[in-house]
């Protein structure tokens, strides 16, 4: 899929409170235990510059188009400085969020936003898409209860159930659109370890 690289690019996607960061970490630790060259990173962020952009993106109220370009600028830095070099060295790269999150969080706020985001991404890095994406499928009602039970620390956490549903159904739509790349892991009633075992079966 990606002619820029020799390694493998794995992403985790979904809304807030679904456990994707936990699953990213668990997969990273598993691959390390197998002596597999692997790095773990995240978006928005992953580099010094991109992490600074993240602070603005998750805490400030931006205009929709400004928010999109902030996310894309951070991604370009992240890809150029971290993801692509690691892939070219033959590493597996695990990324907590990537392009599909930009589609659902920023693209939905704009007219024809889904296509706009993917087209922008292709313009930035035409060959770089994940080899496999795990959509951690947790029902919005369950997800928002989880978020409400923890210290909410960004503008996306504190939005209401309608926002959670919108994001959830966007990821569902993407998983239907790209079934070969996006693997849906139904996780509402599973423990983190059970979810991890399902993920390992797709590797």
Swiss-Prot record:
Q: Which GO terms describe its molecular function?
A: ATP binding; dTMP kinase activity
Its GO CC terms are: cytosol
The lineage's top-level taxon is: Bacteria
Give the matching CDD domains. TMPK
Read off the PROSITE patterns from this record.
THYMIDYLATE_KINASE
Reaction catalysed by this enzyme: dTMP + ATP = dTDP + ADP
Q: Name one GO biological process term.
A: dTTP biosynthetic process
Annotated ATP binding lies at 14-21
Q: Which SUPFAM superfamilies match?
A: P-loop containing nucleoside triphosphate hydrolases (SSF52540)
Kindly state which keywords UniProt assigns to this record, in alphabetical order. ATP-binding, Kinase, Nucleotide biosynthesis, Nucleotide-binding, Transferase
Q: What is its EC number?
A: 2.7.4.9
**Protein family per UniProt:** Belongs to the thymidylate kinase family.
Q: What does this protein do?
A: Phosphorylation of dTMP to form dTDP in both de novo and salvage pathways of dTTP synthesis.
Protein name stated in the entry? Thymidylate kinase
Originating species: Rickettsia rickettsii (strain Sheila Smith)
Chain's gene name:
tmk
